[in-house]
Structure formats: structure tokens, C-alpha cells
């Protein structure tokens, strides 16, 4: 009986630790989002620096790491942007040249529907935009019909 308890405890400690924390202290749900922004990355740093950011790395055959870019939560870089239903939190990836590799909408309370910021075409509009270029809603990014406040907030928090 004591052996059974010990095995259950060991299984919980070993198996459960992977549920709570992913690579280098990064939560698995965040790690999944980072991999969507940098599919070629083999590792990611924990949040560090000022402003707080993750660094995406690729490793070559010898194991040498090369930085691919950075990812940051918009709420940790710019003042809190509020949409129609509240804050909009996005994870933004930037390559080493200052070009957006992608965005992942994290948390929001905006209305859902055919023209939601959760739709893949919303995030796709930001990909390959250079952060040094002017950026305007309606020109660089299409607005979501009937969601002016949501879109304005999303664009301001990314740019």
C-alpha cells in the first residue's frame, strides 16, 4: 500500500509539473502561442528585459542558438487599451528586423461573430508589417464591421 501511494505521488509530481509549467518556466498555453508566432524556433527565453519580452531562438546542427525575434504581451508594453467589452490582450511577435511575424489574440471580451478579432484573417493582416512604417486602420488593416472601438483598440495596442 505504501508503494502504491509513493508511485501515485511520483506520477503526480512528474506528470503534473508539465501541466503547470512548460519550457523554462513558460506556461504551456503561452508556449503554444509563441510557437505560432515563431514556428522555426526551437527554444524560447522566459520573459525578461525592459519592457518584458520573450526571445525566440533557433538552434543549428551544432546546437548554437540564433535569436529569431521577440514576443511581448501588448499590455506589458503600451498603456492598457480597452475595446468595447474591456481590455484586449495580444501577443505580438517581431523578427530581428522589426517586422511583425504575427499576432495571437490572447484575452478579450469583445463580441463574437463573423467579423470577430478571433478570426484568422484579423491576425493575418498584421503579419509582415514593418513597425517603422505608418500604420492606419482602414488602410493597413481592414476594420471589422460594426466593431470600430474594438479595431481601434487592437491597432493602437499593437502599434
Regions found by a protein language model. Give the residues of each.
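A composition-driven signal for long, intrinsically disordered, charge-rich low-complexity tracts
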Residues: 4, 20-21
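Bacterial N-terminal signal peptides that target proteins for export
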Residues: 1-7
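Bacterial N-terminal signal peptides
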Residues: 8-17
Amino acid at each position: 500500500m505504501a508503494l502504491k501511494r509513493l508511485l501515485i505521488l511520483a506520477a503526480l509530481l512528474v506528470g503534473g509539473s508539465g501541466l503547470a509549467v512548460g519550457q523554462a518556466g513558460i506556461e504551456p498555453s503561452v508556449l503554444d502561442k509563441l510557437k505560432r508566432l515563431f514556428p522555426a524556433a526551437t527554444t524560447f527565453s522566459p520573459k525578461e528585459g525592459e519592457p518584458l519580452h520573450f526571445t525566440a531562438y533557433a538552434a543549428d546542427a551544432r546546437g548554437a542558438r540564433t535569436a529569431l525575434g521577440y514576443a511581448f504581451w501588448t499590455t506589458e508594453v503600451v498603456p492598457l487599451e480597452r475595446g468595447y467589452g474591456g481590455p484586449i490582450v495580444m501577443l505580438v511577435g517581431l523578427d530581428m528586423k522589426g517586422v511583425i511575424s504575427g499576432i495571437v489574440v490572447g484575452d478579450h471580451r469583445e463580441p463574437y461573430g463573423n467579423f470577430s478579432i478571433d478570426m484568422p484573417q484579423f491576425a493575418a493582416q498584421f503579419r509582415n508589417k514593418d513597425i517603422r512604417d505608418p500604420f492606419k486602420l482602414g488602410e493597413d488593416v481592414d476594420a471589422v464591421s460594426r466593431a470600430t472601438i474594438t479595431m481601434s483598440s487592437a491597432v493602437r495596442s499593437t502599434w
